[in-house]
Amino acid sequence: MAKTLPIMFQGTHSDAGKSVIATAFCRMFAQDGWKTAPFKSQNMSLNSYVTPDGNEIGRAQGIQAEAAGVAARAEMNPILIKPSREHESQIVVLGKPYGNMQAFAYRNEFFHQGLAVIRQSLETLMNEYDRIVIEGAGSPAEVNLNDRELVNMRVARLANAPVVLIGDIERGGVFASLVGTLALLEPEDRKRVVGVIINKFRGDAALLKPGLDWFEQYTGVPVLGVVPHLPDLAIDAEDSLALERFAASSDDKGAIDIAVIRCPKIANFTDIDPLLTEPDCRVRLVTHAGELGEPDVIVLPGSKNTIEDLMYMKKRGLASRIVSLVNEGKTTVVGLCGGYQMLGDVIRDPHGVETPFPEVKGLGLLPVATTLERTKTTVRSEGMLTWAGERFSVRGYEIHMGRSTPLPGYVPLIEIGGRGEGAKREDGRVLGTYMHDLFHNDAFRTAFFNVIRREKGLASSAVRPFHSLKEAAFDRLAAHVRQHVAVERIEQMMRQFQQR
């Protein structure tokens, strides 16, 4: 049996493109016939993914597993950190909530336990897969943190993995960041760096060549590729920094205006990704009432702290403005997970799960009352949804720590196993659900927006299959990276590294 070969991608800073490059290698290895697993020891993100067996991991590793054509599992991201309050995060270990911890306590009290979980998860994957594509986090040169870090060079040592360092040229100063990172590494760790990739390049590659030659001569580290910027890649983003790029690139020409409310604790914002594929829709992020206008659709995404985000909306005039627009019949509101909880009459927090406030009034647009609980629900779900006189099969996943109970006038949105899930107004102007990926259901998404189109006198649209768009995006990304990165050379380095 051939030995498992790992490769690790680290970056000079956050958002250098580690996740995308790792996704490309997952796809390429799978295309070449290797059973491949992604791995990120510790991920800090509010964008998560539910595995088929009901465990919660970082969204990036779930998407990378999809790119590799394998089922996602908890070992692919054994530790997930979900910021919930100032200086406090929920720690998820092997897909299940471990508890809430402050940063100092996590670093000082959890280190050895975390390291043991990471080591065991890595060993499990290396016993079952041919290739392990490992992603680091932030920078490996954080000298103030490296004595107890759990995600960069310590993981490379555990896996005995060669490291490819990624620099983001889009931000400027790419050679300084690459050279500086290499200079700050411990000598033994620096020996693990077999090459660098320069990511997000725009312009004439000939102008970059003198810099590449200088870098290789100065450091002795080869440049393994220069990856040009790849626009309109329909693959879920994980980093909140991606929201900044999304906001900056939103098309203002769409006939259907969709306002996504961006609160400070926004979570699982990939729920809106399919909306970006609708050719006549303009999707924009809104943070206060002055930006809202009179959109056709308002989306309230998930939240890691629903009460804080609801209070944020009230303070910025968004809550009252949304209620007015709905009551005037000028908009349709969709609440997803935390957004659904906000649409109800009240949110109760008797155990102080999110805030010291025992009860907060909701927007009062749906007849439900929510009680936040200590236990978390993480499950994949499937049911039937009736919309515009048609019944649709819908599937998605739930991640929440609350229970919403019906009040008089309640109408369920989805039927799941004989029970009602979510809620809707009979006029269809307000709907809410705990089901993430609702708009990933192509037939329902098309029917939902066709109602809006008819109201605006627009032609109905045919179904656009989002899943096939994502599969095509994986292939497009893999082809792009194959063209611009010395993939065969990296594979040779992986084999040679194991012979040291």
Curated annotation (Swiss-Prot):
GO terms for molecular function: ABC-type vitamin B12 transporter activity; catalytic activity. The keyword Transport does not apply. Belongs to the CobB/CobQ family. CobQ subfamily. The active site is at residues 337, 436. Pathway: Cofactor biosynthesis; adenosylcobalamin biosynthesis. The gene is cobQ. It comes from the Bacteria. Residues 255-444 form the GATase cobBQ-type domain. This is Cobyric acid synthase. The keyword Translocase does not apply. Keywords: Cobalamin biosynthesis, Glutamine amidotransferase. Catalyzes amidations at positions B, D, E, and G on adenosylcobyrinic A,C-diamide. NH(2) groups are provided by glutamine, and one molecule of ATP is hydrogenolyzed for each amidation.
